[in-house]
Amino acid sequence: RRWKEAREKADLPTDHPNLVMSSAVQVCWEKFCNYFDVEPRYVPISEDHKVLDGHDLDKYVDENTIGVVAIMGVTYTGMYEPVEQISEALDRIEERTGLDVRIHVDGASGGMIAPFIQPDLAWDFRVKRVYSISTSGHKYGLVYPGLGWVVWRETADLPESLIFKVSYLGGEMPTFALNFSRPGAQVLLQYYMFLRLGFDGYRRVQQTSHDVAKYLSGEIEQMDDFTLWNDGSDIPVFAWMLNDKPDRKWNLYDLQDRLRMKGWLVPAYPMPVDLTQVTVQRIVVRNGFSHDMAEAFIKDLKSCVKYLDGLRSPMPSEARASGFHH
């Protein structure tokens, strides 16, 4: 809206807005662009640029760019996108073109991790181009699904034209939402958790998850079959790839199925566009995933790999049955 109002004031067209982001964004951004007729401009990730880090940004940003999305905890791998580095790339673009492009930080996961265990990392309003931040209460905020938060740098950064005022509830009330009636239970629970645990309590919870993720990634890194994509140093999420081995008769999808038989849901999937030839497997560590559980998982992982290594022929790849039928 800020972009549109500025363009209208300058008597310039407003019919082709675009949003720049990594090709590894969560599907919510694809939905946003689709629903609101915004052109998505995806900056491809690669093995050299595993996240949006400012590389090639000048090829995607122009006068119709309404913003750049930086992700604190990429869905595919859990890695942080370096917000400060992205901001510096936008500074260089502004010096050359005069375009003042702002950053929205998608902190769905990292927004509830970085403040507690990485306090010195500049990703928030300490970065001058960051004007809004969103996060989820139900990922690492320790609240059940359905709660999300968004904050702006200043009140003026939320355009007044987006706020509606209603008077039929017994007094004038501002509302900013796509829907109207929403349950308040999640908000109350988040408030309770903040009061109950406090900053130090959240720090201890998130640090424990982080320590477990680092233990798991360290154990997996020592196995000959795998190479880590990342090690869970950002949010407690990490992914790994299968090493090349000419006579191997299985892949990560086979390992996923074997782990599922033991009760572990560890998804395997291709990386996004331009990197789909790379398949990874990912672990998400959250509150409640104890060190004892991590040790049990590593034991089962090694058992599954040993079973698959003992196959005389490749696993069948057609019409694989799922363990879920409900």
Protein language model features and the residues they cover:
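Predominant activation on well-ordered alpha-helical scaffold segments within soluble catalytic domains
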Residues: 1, 30, 84-87, 187-194, ...
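Conserved PLP-enzyme active-site core in the AAT-like
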Residues: 1-164, 169, 185
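Structural signal for hydrophobic packing residues in well-ordered secondary-structure cores
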Residues: 3-7, 40, 61, 90-94, ...
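Generic structural hydrophobic/aromatic packing signal, biased to beta-strands
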Residues: 19, 40, 103, 135, ...
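Catalytic cores of large soluble enzymes that bind and process phosphate-bearing ligands
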Residues: 21-25, 49-52, 74, 78, ...
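A short small-residue
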Residues: 66, 70, 189-196, 282
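Active-site C-terminal subdomain of aminotransferase-like
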Residues: 112-236, 241-246
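Non-catalytic terminal extensions of PLP-dependent enzymes
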Residues: 199-326
